[in-house]
Amino acid sequence: MLIEDAVSSGTPQFVIDSYATLADRAKTQSFGLIEEDVIVLDTETTGLSVQDNELIEISAARLSGREVIDRFDTFVHPKQLIPAEITELTSITNADVADAPSAVEAVAALADFVGGCPVIAHNATFDRSFIESVKGGVNVSDIWIDSLALSRIALPRLASHKLSFMADLFGCDSVSHRANADVDALCGVWRVLLVALTDLPQGLMARLADMHPDVPWSYRPIFSFLAGQNPGSIFSLSAARADVLKADRADDRVDADELPVLKMPSREEIEADYAPGGLVNRMYPTYEPRDEQIAMALEVHDALVTGTHRVIEAGTGVGKSMAYLVPFAEAARRNNITVGIATKSNNLADQLMYHELPKLAEQLNGGLSFCALKGYDHYPCLRKLERMSRGQVEITTKRDPADTLTAVAVIMAYVCQSADGDLDSLGIRWRSVNRPDFTTASRECARRLCPFSLINVWSTVLAVVRRMPMWWSPTIPCCSVTSRPRAGFCLRFVIG
């Protein structure tokens, strides 16, 4: 898999170039103490619920630098039979676990192997909950590092942070839904993550390591060690934002009002896009032409050509999204303009963003960029993010405050590598994090008094004609998101 195909749409080229060299650098770069005597662990269970299911396999590896110096592997005898679907997934049978140690015996042996060293697991909350549900499990380790959350900090632009996806991308051992194979894969991915963290802006590791030092946080020692490799580096959020926006800058779009007429495909070309073997069929191999969808697409086409309006009512199963996306995309590409689409819900916007539009852009062979624009509370306020990262505000969550620090780190990393995007795509546990600590509302936005206002305005002027800004508290009224049209700018979704 190519890096270009593994990152989210709109990833800056400098980020792609950095990701492309990670696997090679991970083979030679050393990280001293933070990769000595660490345990990589994975488990297999009879299901997902710690209340209703049990351990059936535990695997762990002790790392010293780039080498595995010791292994721990055991089946676990459950009190219940292994469900057929689990056997199908893992290939672990009831015969395999018939003579295995009990959960208490297996976890006690694991505790002896780990010896209190830090434990790395992908989605560590899952593995830890099963281990600690067993008597003596809390003695395994006090330090659990979730490589899933760490991957979102280290590699914020990846399209997926599944272990299997990253292992395949970076040439690590493959994942097979067996604990020992998954441990082998994670051993390789772990070093890639450490290298990727060093590619984040200088000073960011120190900023993260120094956040709210009173809060126990398993990632703090990692960030502190990496910060020590560049002592004295100062992190600037405004400078990081300026760099990523500059790298993302492209030629301005044409103002549609300045065009005497839109260049559009003919009605026959639009019909051909929906015919067998046409554009839509290439996007969806099982697609079958629908007369209602073609009729709707032609109405949208005619409205664009004539500069008139249409109100179209279409039932379920017509394929409305593709009926309007194809003519709009052709209008945007052929005229170098930005087209706005107002969806009824953010869920529909996400469906277009992550499903239809990537497929459409691929079949159009480039020339189509797209991004989503939602309401205020879907985007981070840079001013609040800066204050939170400096420890200038209290953590207000009633749950584990470490989750808030992890959210700060994830958002910070994403901001430094992304010109646009929204909070919903970052995998943050909002049940444990107070979202208003990171977002703003119209009544509280500092606007021109905001220390990031110059960045916001620069990004906005660029974005209005090319793509919508994602990381700003809107300061230009015509770009505000509303639930009903206002001055012609009810923009929930933008392609261009």
Where are these regions (language model features)?
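Acidic two-metal-ion nuclease catalytic site recognized across multiple nuclease folds
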Residues: 2-30, 192-267, 271
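Conserved non-catalytic scaffold segment of RNase H-like nuclease domains
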Residues: 10-144, 156-177
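Acidic, Mg2+-coordinating catalytic module of metal-dependent nucleases/exonucleases
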Residues: 115-135, 156-158, 162-229
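A substrate-engagement module of RecA-like helicase motors
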Residues: 256, 270-278, 336, 343-470
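Conserved pre-motif I regulatory segment
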Residues: 265-312
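Conserved two-lobed SF2 helicase motor
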Residues: 469-481
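SF2 helicase catalytic motif II
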Residues: 478, 492-496
